[in-house]
Amino acid sequence: MREDRILVTGGTGMVGKHLQDLIPNATFVGSKDYNLGNIFAVQAMFNDIEPDCVIHLAAKVGGIQDNIANPLAFLEDNLVMNTNVVKTAHDKGVSRFIGILSTCIYPDRLEDDQYPMTEDLLHAGPPTPTNFGYGYSKRMLGVHLDTIRNSTGKDYFSIIPSNLYSEYDHFGDDTKMHLVTALLKKIKNSTNGIVPLFGTGLPLRQFIHAEDLAKIIAMCATRKEQTMTNFNVCCDDSPSILEIAEAGLKAANRDLELQFDSSKPDGQYRKDCDNTVLRELFPDFRFLSLEEGLKRVYNKV
């Protein structure tokens, strides 16, 4: 697939910025360029760019508190945006579509022997209440792509990444920062020897640097072979939030007290995923270590 025929929505966000370094000849659009919630704007975008491949990163996102307070907005805004983009791509004859989901949309609770979660478990139960609206909107994006692939043979599929972090995160907006970035910012800004954190520190999380996700997306977008399957993008390790915070202190070389507020929500206790399909597609891929990634991001905070 030629780079100059690739359209990236959400192209000015965290993952999009890493993709700009990897496939610079693609077309990257942000919310200021086209309103993806407006079907006429979306149709105009496809008429202007005429892509053969779409990488759909654009989404309404927010932290736990924002998702809890506004589940309907996260459901409706993402449903409309995703439907507009996928339907128009299909109608315009786009041959490859890569939708980006998230492991946070997997079922809130499964049996212990169902972890790490494989892709076929995505609909085995409802998503966590703290991501209810967002979770179902992303699931329907995956269903839309599956239906087109199964009925037409087009290379439409979903990539399901675990938690992300990057030096391109929203450092200036506390409501949009990802967990690792918010943690490192609190560590750097601490003046009283304390780092206040939500929850208990017990939940388990898989973290990957956003550049690693971008590399995998770029390989899928430009490869000659069809992918034709959904797959998780995650590393093998699943440390606790406490362990991640301790690693953040080490990366920052600061001796501070981690103070968890157990009255605040934890979110899902665990959502570790299986990466067997990823390893089959790209057996030689190696993830950046959490230690090195934290150092990179801390130096940019």
Predicted regions mapped to residue ranges:
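N-terminal Rossmann NAD(P)H-binding glycine-rich loop of SDR-like oxidoreductase domains
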Residues: D4-I23
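C-terminal substrate-binding subdomain of Rossmann-fold SDR/epimerase-dehydratase oxidoreductases
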Residues: Q20, A182, N189-V301
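Adenosine-cofactor binding site in Rossmann-like domains, unifying the SAM/SAH pocket
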Residues: P24-M45
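NAD(P)H-binding glycine-rich loop region in Rossmannoid oxidoreductase-like domains
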Residues: F40-L79, D91, D108-R109
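Conserved catalytic Lys-bearing alpha helix of Rossmann-like short-chain dehydrogenase/reductases
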Residues: L79-V85, S137-L145
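Conserved Rossmann-fold NAD(P)-dependent oxidoreductase catalytic core, especially the SDR/UDP-sugar
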Residues: T83-N131
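NAD(P)-dependent short-chain dehydrogenase/reductase
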Residues: E111-T118, V143-M219, A247-L249
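Active-site helix of classical SDR
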Residues: G133, S137, K176
